[in-house]
Regions:
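Central regulatory/effector-binding core of bacterial HTH transcription factors
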Residues: 87-129
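Hydrophobic alpha-helical segments within soluble ligand-binding/sensing domains
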Residues: 148-183, 221-225, 284-303
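An alpha-beta-alpha
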Residues: 164-213, 306-320
Length: 321
């Protein structure tokens, strides 16, 4: 018995998006070239779409959710909050991971915007804040970045990072730690504004200490960390707790003791950050509430932007022990 063809199969065979295939079956706009291709494969395979696929366009309780990575820890918290709010309001959510692809983000926004939906939530990438494509689009909420022309739920990064950097450096100075330099390690695919912000804050707070940046092409790949040579008496600020945790392994490989030879600080406060040895100093943001509020704002048609909250988590990795 042959397996029934799906929209995903059609999308894969033709090299077009699943949303394009969905628009074809729901009477939406599809280019003539793609329409001819889909016509041919539908007739050849006697394909008929299932009821769920055909009903998507007719539903008005759908919310699109777009993120660079659905599986990241912080994104998962935003999703949990969004789903909780959606369930309370009998709304349904459709998710799309862009893989940090600029074109994938644009295409997903266009396709969600074409549905009869409540709106779209976008976890901002560095493309989101530069892209004129978004000008004029309605019912879009950005999370993680402040963009004047749209509704945004943004984190108080300047206040949080200033507090984190200043507290860490002042504490080490009070403990008479032999701190000689500062380094910031980040993922090149992430928002560049955080990199610029932390570099400025470090220069203001510790102007006499040398500081440097190091970019990782992909912070999820273990091999990318092999280029990092940790130096004694350096403090390493990391763009995420995940990067910081990878540096723990590098420190062990290089026989450096965290809290004595070097100091490591993260951003994000993952579930297991306080379970590390030594426990990781970091800063926590209210990701769950951001997701929850984003859905509620779409439902209420509230386009006002708002700032989130943060909490410092000062632990052992930033102390001279």
């Amino acid at each position: 018995m042959t397996q029934k063809m799906t929209m995903a199969d059609i999308s894969k065979q033709l090299g077009i998006s699943k949303m394009t295939v969905s628009r074809y079956f729901n009477g939406g706009y599809v280019s003539e070239e793609n329409r001819i291709k889909i016509d041919a494969i539908v007739k050849e395979n006697h394909y008929t779409p299932n009821k769920f696929a055909r009903s998507i366009r007719s539903q008005s309780n759908i919310i699109g959710f777009i993120a660079p990575r659905i599986e990241s820890y912080t994104t998962s918290l935003v999703i949990k909050g969004a789903l909780a709010a959606a369930n309370e309001s009998n709304a349904r959510m459709l998710f799309h991971a862009t893989g940090f692809s600029h074109e994938s983000e644009r295409q997903a926004v266009s396709e969600f915007n074409g549905l009869n939906a409540l709106g779209t939530i976008v976890i901002a990438s560095k493309h989101s804040i530069e892209e004129p494509f978004y000008n004029g689009l309605q019912n879009i909420i950005f999370i993680g970045k402040q963009i004047p022309t749209h509704c945004c739920l943004y984190y108080p990064e300047q206040a949080a990072i200033t507090a984190l950097v200043s507290h860490t450096i002042y504490q080490l100075q009070q403990q008479q730690a032999p701190l000689t330099a500062i380094q910031y390690i980040y993922d090149a695919r992430m928002l560049s504004s955080r990199t610029q912000l932390i570099q400025s804050i470090i220069s203001d707070i510790a102007p006499t200490l040398p500081n440097a940046l190091q970019a990782l092409a992909d912070s999820e790949k273990k091999d990318d960390y092999q280029s990092i040579i940790l130096q004694p008496n350096h403090i390493y600020f990391c763009a995420t707790d995940n990067i910081a945790i990878r540096l723990y392994r590098r420190a062990k490989e290089q026989h450096l003791k965290i809290g004595h030879d070097i100091w490591i600080v993260g951003i994000g406060d993952y579930d297991y950050s306080d379970l590390l040895v030594p426990s990781l100093t970091t800063v926590a943001f209210n990701h769950y509430q951001m997701g929850y509020q984003a859905v509620k704002k779409l439902i209420k048609r509230d386009s006002s932007s708002c700032e989130g909250e943060f909490e410092l988590k000062i632990r052992e990795s930033s102390q001279f022990i």
